[in-house]
C-alpha cells in the first residue's frame, strides 16, 4: 500500500511517498525561507502563491524518485490543518483533485499528528504509551499518548510557542529569519552563567508554558549590555539554556504525572542539539527512553504526512468530495484509530 503525502501548512512544500512494506520511497521538499527572509517572517499570501507554483512539480519529482506511476498510488494524504488557511487550501485542493482523478481515497491529516508520529519513521520507533513534547514555531504542548488518536493535552503555551520565542529573540540579536537555528549556533560560542534568565512558570504547579516574558527579558538584557559579538553569544546562551531547562522541567513533571517511561520529542525545535542532549541525559537518569526524528523530519515535511496518512487510511479515514481545511484544530479532537 502506497500513500502520497502533501504538506503545505506554512512555508515548506513537502511531498513524499510512503510504502507500508518498503518504507519511504520518495521525499521532496522546497523551503520558502529566502522568499520570506526580507520580511522577517512568513507572509501568508506569498506562501500560498509559492505553494501553487511548487506543489505539482514536486509531486512529479516524487513519482520520478520512487519509480512509480500515478496508477500505483493507493491514497493521497494532505495536511488539512492547523496552519495558514491559504497555504492549507493549496495542498488540500491539489490532494483532493488528484485523489478524484486517480480514483483513490483522500486522507486529511492533522499537521501536529504528523509531527507526533514522525519518530515512527526511524529504525527504533517508540511504543505506546508515551509523553509527547510537541515544540515548534506555532505550538508548545505536552501530550499523553496511549495510542493513535488517543491524545490528552497535559499542558501548552499560554502565549508564544518556544520556536516563536527563539525566532523573535534571534531577530533582537540581529540574526536573519529564521533565526532559531542561528541563535543556537551563536549560543554554542557563549559563556554559561554570565547572564541568568528566568525559567517561566516553573515556580508553580502545572504543565503550561509561557515564553513571551522570556523574550521581553532578552530584549531588556540586549538593550542594557554591549553589542560586541561575545556579549551577544552569551545572551543567546542564557536564552537557550532557559528555554531548554523550562522544557525539561515540564517534561519531567509530565512523566511523573503519567508514570510513563518513554518521551517523544517532535516539531522543529526538537532538532535543537542542546535540548536533545539534556532530555537524553534526563531520561537516562530516569531509566527511560527518549525518541525523536532525524533533523530533516523535525521541521515540516511530506514524509510525516504520508506516514500519518497511511496510519489513518488503514483505520478507515477518508474525506468527502469537498475541500475543507481547519486553520485551528485541537489535536485532542482527533478520533482514535
Swiss-Prot record:
Instruction: Tell me the function of this protein.
Output: Required for the formation of a threonylcarbamoyl group on adenosine at position 37 (t(6)A37) in tRNAs that read codons beginning with adenine. Is involved in the transfer of the threonylcarbamoyl moiety of threonylcarbamoyl-AMP (TC-AMP) to the N6 group of A37, together with TsaE and TsaB. TsaD likely plays a direct catalytic role in this reaction.
Q: Which PROSITE patterns match?
A: GLYCOPROTEASE (PS01016)
This enzyme catalyses: L-threonylcarbamoyladenylate + adenosine(37) in tRNA = N(6)-L-threonylcarbamoyladenosine(37) in tRNA + AMP + H(+)
Give the protein name, as stated in the record.
tRNA N6-adenosine threonylcarbamoyltransferase
What compartments host this protein? Answer: Cytoplasm
What keywords were assigned to this record?
Acyltransferase, Cytoplasm, Iron, Metal-binding, Transferase, tRNA processing
* Cofactor(s) required, per the database record: Fe(2+)
Instruction: Return the InterPro entries for the record.
Output: ATPase_NBD, Gcp-like_dom, KAE1/TsaD, Peptidase_M22_CS, TsaD
Q: Name one GO cellular component term.
A: cytoplasm
Please share the entry's free-text remark on the cofactor.
Answer: Binds 1 Fe(2+) ion per subunit.
- Name the Enzyme Commission number(s) assigned to this protein: 2.3.1.234
Output the Gene Ontology terms for molecular function: iron ion binding; N(6)-L-threonylcarbamoyladenine synthase activity
Which GO terms are recorded in the biological process aspect for this UniProt protein? tRNA threonylcarbamoyladenosine modification
List positions binding Fe cation: 111, 115, 300
Q: Which Gene3D superfamilies does the record associate with it?
A: 3.30.420.40
| The family this protein is said to belong to | Belongs to the KAE1 / TsaD family.
Binding-site list for substrate: 134-138, 167, 180, 272
Q: List the disulfide bonds.
A: none
Taxonomic classification: Bacteria, Pseudomonadati, Pseudomonadota, Gammaproteobacteria, Enterobacterales
